[in-house]
From Swiss-Prot:
Organism: Shewanella loihica (strain ATCC BAA-1088 / PV-4)
Major localization class: cytoplasm
One GO BP annotation of this record: AMP salvage
Protein's job: Catalyzes a salvage reaction resulting in the formation of AMP, that is energically less costly than de novo synthesis.
Assigned protein family: Belongs to the purine/pyrimidine phosphoribosyltransferase family.
Name used for this protein in its record: Adenine phosphoribosyltransferase
Subunit-level organization: Homodimer.
Location relative to the cell: Cytoplasm
NCBIfam families assigned: apt, PRK02304.1-1, PRK02304.1-2, PRK02304.1-3, PRK02304.1-5
Gene transcribed to yield this protein: apt
UniProt superkingdom: Bacteria
Keyword check for Nucleotidyltransferase: no
Any single GO CC term annotated in Swiss-Prot or TrEMBL for this entry: cytosol
């Protein structure tokens, strides 16, 4: 990968200490999007990786996955499918719950958004524990979609998401890693 682009991307991500609670180092990708060169570099690196893999749909998870998934889908010339929190999608949906640090949450997808045999790329801004993406992949597979790849701007490797998703058979691309810095 282009090391200059990767450096630009990582430098553009601001770290906010003690947000949303004490002890958390929040990685803010909205600062990346404020820099057009960094945002373009992010999408360009994803396009370079996935342009020849036969992807037919890009799925983005609520909400920041939309910010990277939709422009990537346009560049690849394929459809974009949002995966959302309950009650946000107007047509018939299926849902999948997943565990959070303290409790659980749920995601939904339109039942007609993925067709059997679709080759789906899942995109999100950040990979932490992998719970959100695991639930997303289960939804896609339930609809007959094939998911082999997931792409992230940021990975927090110490939280175990990479291992969790590898166990699901996913090949991962992350542009930046942050270790408890």
């Amino acid at each position: 990968m282009n090391t200059d682009k990767l450096a630009l991307i990582k430098q553009s991500i601001k770290t906010i200490p003690d947000y949303p609670k004490p002890g958390i180092m929040f990685r803010d990708v909205t600062s990346l999007m404020e820099d057009p060169a960094a945002y373009q570099a992010t999408i360009a690196l994803f396009v370079e990786r996935y342009k020849d893999l036969g992807v037919t749909k890009v799925v983005g998870t609520e909400a920041r996955g939309f910010l990277f998934g939709a422009p990537l889908a346009l560049e690849l010339g394929v459809g974009f499918v949002p995966v959302r929190k309950p009650g946000k999608l107007p047509r018939e949906t299926i849902s999948e719950s997943y565990e959070l640090e303290y409790g659980h949450d749920m995601l939904e997808i339109h039942t007609d958004a993925i067709k059997p045999g679709d080759k789906v790329l899942v995109v999100d801004d950040l990979l932490a524990t992998g719970g959100t993406i695991e639930a997303t992949v289960k939804l896609i597979r339930q609809l007959g979609g094939e998911v082999e790849h997931a792409a992230f701007v940021i990975s927090l490797p110490e939280l175990g998401g990479e291992h969790r998703l590898a166990e699901m058979g996913l090949s991962l691309m992350t542009l930046c890693e942050f270790e408890g810095e």
